Design a protein with these regions (language model features):
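Core segments of cupin and vicinal oxygen chelate
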Residues: 2, 13-56, 94
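Conserved catalytic-core motifs of GNAT/GCN5-like acyltransferases
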Residues: 31-39, 102-104, 126, 143-148
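Short, charged/polar surface micro-motifs in flexible loops or helix N-caps
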Residues: 51-55, 63, 83-87
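Acidic/histidine-enriched, glycine/proline-rich intrinsically disordered or flexible terminal extensions
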Residues: 142-160
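Residues that flank catalytic or metal-binding motifs in active/ligand-binding sites
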Residues: 6, 44, 52-54, 74-76, ...
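Vicinal oxygen chelate
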Residues: 14-18, 71-135, 146, 157
Length: 160
C-alpha cells in the first residue's frame, strides 16, 4: 500500500502578494521557484522552496486584513524546524523579521510583537520562538531536542 511520504506544501492566501513574497523570500530566505498564471495572464500563485521536498505557495488577493485569530477554527500556525534556534532567530530578525510572544489578556491568547526574540521551552520539550508574516499568519520556529516527546514517540513506534 502506498504511504504518505511527507507534507508537500503550505498554501497561504495573502492580501498583498509582493509584500508577502518579500517577507518569505528576503526575511525567511525561501527562494522563489516559479509563478503560475491564469489563462488571462493574472497571477495564480507564487511557489517558494523551503526544502527540496517542502514548499510554500502564496495565492494573491486575500480579502481580509489579517489571518484569523488563534481561537478560530482552521490553521493555528505552521512550524519550521531549525538546527540552532538562537542563531536562526537572530538572523531572521536582522533581515527584518518581527519577533513575537504569546500573551493572554482576559482569557484570550494572542501572539504579539515584542522588542527582542523570546525563546521558550515548549510542553513537548523543544525550544521555540515565534513570529508573524505580514498577514498575521503565525510561524513557530522549533529546535527539536533529542529527547523531546516527538522523538520519544518515534522511538516507541519503531519498536512496535
Amino acid at each position: 500500500m502506498p504511504a504518505i511520504t511527507g507534507l508537500g506544501h503550505v498554501a497561504l492566501k495573502v492580501k498583498d502578494v509582493e509584500r508577502s513574497l518579500a517577507f518569505y523570500r528576503d526575511v525567511m530566505q525561501f527562494p522563489e521557484m516559479m509563478r503560475l498564471h491564469h489563462d488571462d495572464g493574472s497571477l495564480f500563485l507564487i511557489y517558494l522552496r523551503i526544502t527540496d521536498t517542502q514548499y510554500l505557495e502564496l495565492f494573491p488577493d486575500g480579502v481580509d486584513d489579517t489571518a484569523p485569530g488563534p481561537d478560530h477554527t482552521g490553521m493555528h500556525h505552521f512550524c519550521l524546524t531549525i538546527d540552532v534556534i538562537e542563531q536562526t532567530v537572530d538572523q531572521i530578525v536582522a533581515r527584518g523579521g518581527i519577533p513575537c510572544a504569546w500573551t493572554t489578556e482576559n482569557g484570550t491568547s494572542a501572539l504579539r510583537p515584542v522588542d527582542k526574540p523570546v525563546i521558550t521551552d515548549g510542553l513537548d520539550g523543544n525550544r521555540q520562538s515565534w513570529l508573524q508574516d505580514p498577514d498575521g499568519n503565525r510561524i513557530e520556529l522549533m529546535e527539536m531536542a533529542p529527547d523531546c516527546l516527538q522523538m520519544q514517540a518515534i522511538r516507541k513506534l519503531k519498536d512496535m
